[in-house]
Amino acid sequence: MKMLKEVCPSPSVIFDLGVRNPFSEIMKQNNYKVYNTGGEDLDDNHEMEIPDDVDLVTGFEILEHLVSPYPLLKNIKANRILLTVPIKLWFAKAYKSETDPLDRHYHEFEPWQFDWLLEKSGWKIIKKEYWKNPSKKFGIRPLLRKFTNRYYAVYAERTKESYTNCYKGELNL
């Protein structure tokens, strides 16, 4: 919430990639108006309609679930984004649910990889933050998590050239 408040103070209008979730409610409680996607597959539907009053598009732990996040990032009609992704850890395998095919990580990025993806899709990174996810469990991996960044947040703005092409409809892939 801290980074969101820094890059887009309330009251503001947020378009959050992903279905309504507990964080959507927290944003509302902090005086943000929040729109969410409706649960559609964002790999297939990367040309979504974003309301004109939106100040910022957010995606919290969403892009790792896409086979290819590039078309979504390239085509999204927004000027500003705030995204978070899990960082690939050398001591843990990527997450996959055995029961829910939508709850699987196709990607866990190293920060430089995510930066390159954003830059290639027409975004200029303005601010970055990292944080840890310590566990109260006992063991080697929980101990390593106390000292290892697990999540990466990026605030970016669309580059001028990319903005012009996106709003002319020239980016569809």
PLM features per residue range, with description:
Residues 61-65:
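A short His-aromatic
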